[in-house]
């Protein structure tokens, strides 16, 4: 997701996420008052980026659902259970891109299919390219951030309860991805 002047990568270069510098986070309202945040500890991102032809760019994200963390073991177990992610049946969340659009400057939209609990819906990620650099130790890298908002009920996570007139969990969930993609050496 770079312009030809911005990248030194050869066309259709394969990239992978650096797991030490990549995070997928989420946020949802609890009782309409507080934002609960969490992340997934096991995420893989791979793809091909062609700086000359955005339509040749494709990315795939795979998240291991059991790796969900919110700093609360009871809540994590609830999120892994059947009311939410149902990790024993659905071990992964996937996103497969279909189109990239350059919005302007360092901003892009990355549209594709998000699959959670066996249900797939189109989602558009709003992407900001933070920069690109060559690190002699760690390789050629592109740094980015992306975000989207989804309705969890669209993906079969319909549990909710009213407490004192307030819903326990918001329907809207914000997804935030930040990280570094590393150019994979070509064989």
Residue locations for each model-derived region?
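Low-complexity, acidic/polar, glycine-enriched regions of mature
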Residues: 1-187
């Amino acid at each position: 997701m770079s312009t030809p002047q911005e990248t030194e990568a050869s066309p259709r270069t394969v990239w992978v996420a650096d797991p030490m510098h990549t995070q997928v986070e989420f946020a949802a309202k609890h009782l309409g008052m507080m934002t609960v945040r969490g992340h997934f500890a096991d995420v893989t991102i791979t793809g091909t980026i062609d700086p000359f032809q955005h339509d040749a760019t494709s990315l795939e994200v795979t998240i291991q659902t059991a790796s969900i963390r919110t700093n609360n073991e009871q809540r994590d177990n609830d999120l892994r259970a059947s009311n939410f992610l149902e990790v024993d049946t659905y071990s992964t969340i996937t996103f497969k891109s279909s189109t990239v659009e350059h919005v302007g400057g360092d901003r892009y939209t990355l549209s594709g299919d998000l699959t959670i609990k066996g249900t797939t819906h189109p989602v558009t990620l709003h992407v900001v390219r933070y920069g690109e650099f060559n690190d002699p130790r760690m390789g050629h890298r592109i740094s980015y951030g992306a975000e989207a908002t989804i309705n969890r009920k669209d993906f079969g996570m319909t549990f909710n309860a009213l407490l004192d007139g307030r819903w326990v969990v918001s329907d809207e969930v914000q997804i935030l991805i930040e990280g570094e993609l590393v150019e994979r050496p070509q064989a």
